[in-house]
Amino acid sequence: MSNSFSFQRQNPGSPLQQHSPIHNINTGGNSNSVSNQSNNHPQTPGHHVPSRKPSIVEMLSSPPPLPNTPDQEDIHSFSLSRNTSVSSRASSIYGNVNGGTSKGSIVGVDWAEIPLVELTESNKLVSINSGFSVQKAFETLMEHNLTSVPVSLSKTDSTDLTNCLTFDYSDVNTYLLLIMNKINLNDLSIYEGGDDVLSNQQKDSITKSINKAKKGEEVPVDFIVKLHPKNPFVKFSEQDTLYKAMESLGNGVHRVAITNMNGTKITGILSQRRLIKYMWENARRFPSLDFYINSTLQDLKIGSNNPITIYEDQLLIEALLKMFTERVTSLAVVDKTMALIGNISIVDVKNVTSSKNSHLLFKSVLGFIGYNLTQKGIEEGQDQFPIFHVNNQSSLGRVIAKLVATKSHRLWVVENRGSVHHGSVSSTSSSNSNSNSKSVTQSPKASPSTIESTLNQSVSTPSNVQNIPPGSEPGGLPGKLVGVVTLTDILGLFASSKSNKKIDPQFARNQRRRSSTSTTRSSFEGSSAGQDLFRKSYTTSAPAKTEGKR
């Protein structure tokens, strides 16, 4: 049996994304290791010698310096972004006005009291209307290098966001699974204007839209965004304080809307990823963060010891289905010994939307990771391997630096090498980032050598992951997976430090899971090559294969 996937081919015209200096580690055969890159080498006469860049260990040691400070030109100063963000410059002004400066030092500012207007992006908010096709909505994500886009329920005015849903890669995944007959109407949580029970007419309309999609015909985006459970569309005024947004995002909402004072117009979207970047770039301005940034994950007791995983030899389609059923956006890829091999994200679904790549759906997850890294090497001219793991002795500051640099939502926690008797993560971590954070005893900063060792483990992993056999020597893999730490955990920790309220990082995810078993749903949740999406016919059957146990 075969189904047609219908999206037209588009030209890869989106601009290349700028990467921060430590977004990826070059692991090509002709490249020096991280430690070699930071060493001094004899200069060759007649050759231009570029200025020395700070090593990765230096870059992960502390937050970037504030702008306009005397040490700005110091060789160890750095910024995780090539250009200071608008919000960072605004907060600099805000800090100077409220705290003042003296001999280059900034008087501490309470981040919780900063108005959200300081974080509003100055660039135009991208949105679409519900009359867009799923294809056009997908192209919008690709063109603007977004992970989500607001969908106005107005059929004509995409800027009218007083009532809107959102379209993201979870919706693309749902669309794909529907077409592949991996999920059906009973697996979905249909949102139809708040009705508790769908009428027969509504069910017929939904069934017709699903059948049209399977035939390769275009369907409106408002159809697909109503099929995947999401969190409430949370709005805050520009005059609300940062604490309010931090509390919401710390409870697991992926992004919130910022409106004008009258609440009549959305002026920006604040995501978890953007907020953590803002907090990192301005960390020196917020003395209340010092204790947390210098403490280890083990001491802070944040993160979860139950990461959701997929085995390396399971099919990619199984991984996509697991992300749908578990309502998560990422899976850790492990071998049979629970050694961490890699990571697969919901955004990766874009790489199988082309008919020429449909065969990857029935290939192993490990093979798909290898394909992704190969493509990234082709696009950027080098083999690359992202740093996606930490250990419990990593300081929170270095964890945040990695999250910002890799633009990730989570990092996998692996067992410390050489710490066989270290104990399980359950004794050091909690799924609740609240964990009485105020009573945590401060620990010394993690030594650079520990982090350097962790980074060197990443570098030692071959860029072509397909060449790693399941039973390979442990030295070739980061280590045994014992947990995961997310943006939600960290933002929840910051929020709980300012109040006695319970911050539950699992709140939003549990809400999505509950809504997936009902007939109603709330509406809002919280990379870069053009491809044709689901245009040609491909089979939904696959060779018989035994599913790996989890």
Swiss-Prot record:
This protein's name: Protein SDS23
Entry-linked CDD domains: CBS_pair_SF
Single Gene Ontology BP annotation: regulation of mitotic metaphase/anaphase transition
Residue stretches of biased makeup (Polar residues): 1-23, 444-469
Subcellular location: Cytoplasm; Nucleus
Family recorded in the similarity comment: Belongs to the SDS23 family.
Stretches with biased composition (Low complexity): 24-40, 421-443
An annotated Gene Ontology molecular function: protein serine/threonine phosphatase inhibitor activity
SMART domains referenced in this protein's UniProt entry, alphabetically: CBS
Gene that produces this protein: SDS23
Annotated CBS domain residues: 227-288, 302-361, 374-431, 435-502
Cited function: Involved in DNA replication and cell separation.
Keyword Ribonucleoprotein: no
Alphabetical UniProt keywords: CBS domain, Cytoplasm, Nucleus, Repeat
Region (Disordered): 1-78, 421-477, 504-550
Gene3D superfamilies in the record: CBS-domain (3.10.580.10)
Main location: cytoplasm
Top-level taxon in the UniProt lineage: Eukaryota
Gene Ontology cellular component list: cytoplasm; nucleus
UniProt entry tagged with the keyword Phosphoprotein: no
